[in-house]
Amino acid sequence: MRGTVLAEGIGEKLTPLPPMPKCQILIAKPPISVSTKMVYEKLDSCEIKEHPDIDGILDGLKNQDLEQVAASLGNVLEKVTVEAYPVIAQIKECMMEAGALGAMMSGSGPTVFGIFRDRRTAKEAFTKVKAQNLAKQIYLANVHNVRRR
């Protein structure tokens, strides 16, 4: 399956969604590795108070509202991983200070992505993350999906 999808269950149920609005995505992986097992073990003992705003993301996609998509991001694993690896929070903060509409850890970490409206701002964030030696690998991607027929 191609394009934007909603994954449910353990990823086995995929539902096609409207495309992601045109944007730039900055991806930064710090020079660490994270044990997914450790994250899930600690998650079980952690109280989860906030959950991703799935409805907000779905509405943002439907309305092609990039700000709403970015504002609705959430990852319940992030709290656990950031406690063990504060560099993840530093990367997010750097991206947000550089103009990201939203930034979030991907999966159980350690990779962080930031959503940017334009390439200039995303490149500035790329330069800042690199200058602070926060990430070992940094990539900039252009998202420009076309609507499904």
Task: Give names to the regions the model predicted.
Residues 2, 7-102, 117-120, 126-130, ...:
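Conserved, helical-rich catalytic subdomain that frames metal- and/or nucleotide-binding sites
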Residues 104-105, 114:
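Conserved SAM-binding loop
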